[in-house]
């Protein structure tokens, strides 16, 4: 708490068994650098580079690239953070995130008071409920954020049992996953979204 971390070089995590930073309540200055090769496949909820970004914390000017696809529990997932209650400024995430509930390209859940400004995602996100490119569930504020990634296309494209060329024979009970609250920027929001694009 109250500490400032300054990233002075790009970081490559491809050969590292990385454990998410449990909680962060200081200032993280990315200085435009990239953390690549983030891979999280172990069991557990609330996953990302950071598990929890706390109230009063700031993460800025950082790019994160990687893959998150945990075993077992798969809720609150995002490449940058599983949960954000602080400020995320001018950050970019690129890669693949797969899970169940509150799945976002950048952040799984943006808590009340949490803020994302000038952030962007590219890649693919797959989830069941509250799924989107920037934030899975938004209770805070999203400003000037953008998504250019694909959302929930994996199951539709890769399921050999699904024949979308014959809609008359489509059995939605069998072939279409029961996804809810899926969007481009935010899957579900009871917060504020302004000047965002998808």
What kind of feature is each model-predicted range?
Residues 1-198:
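Surface-exposed repetitive/solenoidal architectures
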């Amino acid at each position: 708490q109250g500490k400032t971390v300054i990233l002075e070089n790009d970081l490559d995590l491809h050969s590292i068994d990385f454990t998410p930073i449990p909680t962060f309540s200081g200032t993280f200055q990315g200085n435009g650098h990239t953390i690549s090769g983030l891979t999280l496949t172990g069991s557990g909820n609330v996953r990302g580079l950071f598990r929890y970004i706390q109230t009063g914390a700031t993460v800025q000017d950082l790019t994160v690239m990687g893959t998150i696809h945990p075993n077992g529990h798969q809720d609150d997932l995002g490449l940058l953070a599983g949960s954000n209650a602080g400020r995320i400024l001018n950050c970019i995430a690129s890669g693949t995130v797969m899970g169940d509930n509150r799945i976002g390209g950048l952040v799984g859940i943006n808590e009340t008071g949490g803020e994302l400004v000038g952030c962007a995602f590219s890649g693919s996100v797959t989830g069941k409920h509250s799924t989107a490119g920037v934030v899975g569930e938004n209770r805070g504020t999203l400003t000037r954020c953008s998504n250019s990634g694909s959302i929930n296309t994996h199951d539709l494209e890769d399921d050999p049992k699904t024949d979308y060329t014959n809609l008359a024979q489509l059995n939605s009970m069998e072939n279409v996953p029961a996804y809810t609250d899926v969007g481009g920027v935010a899957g579900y929001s009871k917060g504020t979204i302004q000047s965002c694009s998808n």
